[in-house]
UniProtKB/Swiss-Prot annotation:
This is 13 kDa ribonucleoprotein-associated protein. GO terms for cellular component: box C/D methylation guide snoRNP complex; nucleolus; precatalytic spliceosome; small-subunit processome; U4/U6 x U5 tri-snRNP complex. InterPro entries: eL8/uL1-like, H/ACA_rnp_Nhp2-like, Ribosomal_eL30-like_sf, Ribosomal_eL8-like_CS, Ribosomal_eL8/eL30/eS12/Gad45, Ribosomal_eL8/Nhp2. One of its GO terms (molecular function) is RNA binding. It is found in: Nucleus, Nucleolus. The keyword rRNA processing applies. Keywords: mRNA processing, mRNA splicing, Nucleus, Ribonucleoprotein, Ribosome biogenesis, RNA-binding, rRNA processing, Spliceosome. PANTHER family: RIBOSOMAL PROTEIN L7AE FAMILY MEMBER.
């Protein structure tokens, strides 16, 4: 794998990446996950997004760079993970995924884990 794009900031470290990918896998079981840049944009605009995860090895990177701007407008944390293939596997699809959105839900089985990951992502953004 090539070096991650310098525009991909903030980039999660290995432990945070694993934590995020585990949470994404669980969120997909609870139907709290939207896959792809377009669906992530929709969740941001609807206000149901907890946080956004993007892949740093997207080529060209510009296809996801509208999301950090939207996230900052909506005050939603966002983070880059190193691999689109790993993100796709965590989402439960056989294709690479460039971005994913973990959404809010009334059932809230994952709420404590979502809050933990959100805090870790917000610490990266400071």
């Amino acid at each position: 794998m090539s070096a991650p794009n310098p525009k991909a900031f903030p980039l999660a470290d290995a432990t945070l990446t694993n934590q995020i990918l585990d949470l994404i896998q669980q969120a997909s079981h609870y139907k709290q996950l939207k896959k792809g840049a377009n669906e992530a944009t929709k969740t941001l605009n609807r206000g149901i997004c907890e946080f956004i995860v993007m892949a740093a090895d997207v080529e060209p990177i510009e296809i996801v760079l509208h999301l950090p701007l939207l996230c900052e407008d909506k005050n939603v944390p966002y983070v880059f993970v190193p691999s689109k293939t790993a993100l796709g596997r965590a989402c439960g699809v056989s294709r690479p995924v460039v971005s994913a959105s973990v959404t809010t839900n009334e059932a809230r089985e994952l709420q404590s884990q979502i809050q933990t990951v959100k805090l870790a992502i917000e610490r990266l953004l400071i």
